């Protein structure tokens, strides 16, 4: 039996209990009103898995055994802890608090998915190792999810005992007075936030407001309304660039209007959330002190400018009655300056390398700082998330979180370069973090992959994720490479010439250029293996395989594109003997299917920008003929 996260203590015992159609789900008298919602979750699971509808009751019956839900404080378990007992007489879940009762129900739902109506007798005691186990989700760099998807995401977070969700905003909220910023988009509305916040509250998920307040304000600072607040001037007529959106576009912190702008955004956004937290972000201010603020930087240094700015924002958050969070990439250059910030501020310590640095966590710990350790699901700039890199990164960051007694583990899902990757391929990385934030005994990769295959995808063989892991590695030319080169060739990016790009980039891909046919053959084999596995999967799992099949088809096309461009710009032989015109048509046909896949989970957002890149590639390929 697979459980994610793995419980702290699990004792399997002799015997079974068979749930009958006359059983009831009984709420103890001490249960809060929220317990009825948890009972409904359980009843829905039983109907889905076994086709039986159990009545929910609040009276104790001797004639109707079944499942009892109780709330009783257990100080040693904390408010999120619970006990689950299955005996020949029935099932009993005791939550130390509301959240604990919910998590006990979620664990029983996982057991039901694997065991059906005949449950093994067991005694399970469980509680989280880390207080905060969260997901940071980018809804600003191209893909804005539908409300249905966001609720499904919250359901999945709760199912795996995550208790915090950040939706990252730069410009994709309907801020008053910002119509020039969001006029061509499909932004989230105040009602969207209120609806999602209430939905998350019922699942014991803290929906945290998260707004860019220093760097990464590309779309805001390219408008006529706010252009003058940019640290470094850029012609407003400059064409859109995925690459440039990741760089530059930092606020001029010496301009009082910049502070007024950020306060307006914060003051509009914060009242929509019930959370006691506010995430001001503040990462990667690449231009700070290099343009309009250079005089101050020469006087006090850019680091002090940063600390002073973050300090102002933190104090404003506290004045609004909330606790601030910010990214730690800049403060780590001088961790002692944490002492200049409010004592309760939380520093989000990110590192997405498969072998992240330990000294950053150690330095913040030495300063007595509250910190979250923040790994990533490794999907940005990819067609399919790199599961091998995600596991390695999450495991190391989780180990540091436990070692340095961090306040939490917050896994990130970023959407660099248009958020091409489908949300489905981020699920394994999210579950890696859920498993490792709850239990400090970090499971081996094969074991965890087998568990996710069984619990999340209903794959009784337990093989699915090992196949997806191999599939995700078959990359010669990724989406990030394609975007960079296309923007250089089209003149949207002038930092490098094509020749300079190839000189920098070729060593990264050259070992695999002669293997494109082999790599694409491995993709074909993985796709075949997924399809052959479907009979071992439940229906819901089968329906979720399309994103992996479609996106890996896209990766095959990008790999073939590498061979043609290498031939064109470096004079190499075309090992695949392919016709550029044929590849152009295949890219366009693939994009037509991709648009349908996008619409399953996302608003229109900036899908058209991905299309523009695909169409430009197709036009270039036709010009080569």
Across the structure, where does each feature detected by a protein language model lie?
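Contiguous, structured surface segment used for ligand recognition
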Residues: 1-133, 396, 419
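Substrate-binding groove of N-acetylhexosamine-processing glycoside hydrolases
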Residues: 2-14, 19-21, 34-39, 62-63, ...
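A generic structural motif
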Residues: 30-31, 141-143, 353
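A generic structural signal for short coil/turn motifs at secondary-structure boundaries
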Residues: 33, 93, 144-145, 289, ...
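Generic structural signal for residues in well-ordered beta-strands
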Residues: 46, 53-56, 207, 324, ...
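Short loop/turn and capping residues at structural boundaries
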Residues: 50, 57-60, 168, 211, ...
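N-terminal small/glycine-rich loop or linker at the start of catalytic domains
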Residues: 122-140, 372-381
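Substrate-binding cleft of carbohydrate-active enzyme catalytic domains
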Residues: 131-328, 338-340, 346-348, 357, ...
């Amino acid at each position: 039996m697979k459980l994610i996260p793995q419980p702290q203590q699990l004792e399997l015992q002799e015997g079974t209990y068979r749930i009958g159609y006359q059983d009831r789900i009984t709420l103890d008298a001490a249960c809060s009103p929220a317990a009825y919602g948890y009972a409904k979750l359980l009843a829905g699971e039983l109907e889905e898995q076994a086709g039986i509808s159990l009545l929910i009751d609040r009276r104790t019956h001797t004639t109707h055994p079944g499942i009892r839900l109780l709330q009783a404080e257990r100080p040693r378990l904390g408010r999120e802890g619970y006990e689950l007992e299955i005996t020949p007489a029935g099932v009993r879940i005791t939550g130390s608090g509301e959240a604990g009762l919910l998590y006990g129900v979620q664990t029983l739902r996982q057991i039901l998915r694997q065991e059906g109506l005949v449950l093994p007798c067991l005694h399970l005691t469980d509680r989280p190792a880390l207080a905060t186990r969260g997901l940071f989700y980018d809804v600003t760099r191209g893909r804005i999810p539908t409300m249905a998807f966001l609720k499904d995401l919250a359901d999945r977070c709760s199912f795996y005992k995550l208790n915090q969700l950040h939706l990252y905003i730069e410009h994709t909220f309907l801020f008053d007075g910002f119509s020039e910023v969001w006029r061509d988009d499909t932004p989230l509305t105040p009602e969207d936030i209120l609806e999602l916040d209430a939905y998350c509250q019922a699942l014991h998920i803290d929906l945290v407001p998260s707004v860019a307040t220093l760097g990464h304000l590309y779309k805001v600072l390219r408008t006529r309304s706010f252009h003058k607040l940019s640290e470094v001037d850029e012609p407003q007529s400059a064409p859109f660039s995925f690459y440039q959106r990741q760089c530059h576009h930092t606020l001029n912190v010496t301009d009082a209007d910049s502070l007024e702008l950020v306060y307006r955004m914060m003051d509009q956004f914060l009242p929509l959330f019930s959370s006691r937290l506010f995430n001001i972000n503040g990462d990667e201010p690449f231009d700070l002190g290099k343009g309009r603020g250079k005089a101050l930087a020469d006087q006090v240094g850019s680091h002090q400018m940063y600390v002073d700015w973050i300090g102002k924002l933190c104090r404003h958050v506290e004045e609004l009655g909330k606790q601030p969070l910010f990214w730690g990439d800049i403060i780590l250059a001088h961790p002692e300056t944490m002492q200049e910030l409010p004592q309760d501020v939380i520093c989000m310590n990110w590192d997405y390398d498969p072998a992240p640095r330990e000294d950053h966590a150690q330095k913040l710990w030495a300063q007595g700082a509250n910190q979250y350790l923040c790994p990533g699901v490794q999907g940005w700039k990819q067609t399919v998330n790199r599961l091998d890199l995600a596991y390695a990164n999450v495991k190391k960051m989780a180990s540091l979180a436990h070692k340095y007694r961090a306040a939490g583990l917050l896994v990130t899902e970023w959407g660099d370069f248009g958020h091409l990757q489908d949300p489905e391929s981020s699920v394994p990385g999210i579950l890696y973090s859920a498993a490792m934030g709850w239990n400090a005994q970090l499971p081996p990769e094969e074991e965890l992959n087998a568990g996710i295959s069984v619990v999340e995808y209903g794959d009784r063989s337990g093989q699915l994720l090992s196949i997806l892991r191999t599939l995700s590695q078959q990359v010669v030319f990724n989406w990030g490479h394609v975007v960079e080169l296309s923007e250089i060739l089209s003149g949207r990016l002038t930092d490098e010439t094509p020749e300079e790009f190839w000189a920098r980039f070729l060593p990264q891909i050259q070992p695999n250029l002669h293997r494109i046919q082999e790599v694409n053959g491995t993709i074909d084999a993985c796709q075949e293996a997924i399809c052959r596995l479907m009979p071992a999967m439940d229906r819901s799992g089968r329906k979720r395989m399309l994103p992996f099949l479609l996106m890996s088809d896209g990766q095959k096309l990008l790999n073939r594109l590498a061979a043609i461009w290498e031939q064109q710009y470096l004079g190499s032989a075309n090992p695949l003997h392919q016709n550029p015109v044929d590849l152009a048509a295949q890219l366009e046909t693939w994009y037509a299917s991709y648009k349908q896949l996008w619409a399953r989970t996302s608003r229109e957002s900036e899908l058209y920008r991905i299309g523009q890149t695909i169409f430009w590639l197709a036009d270039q390929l036709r010009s080569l003929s």
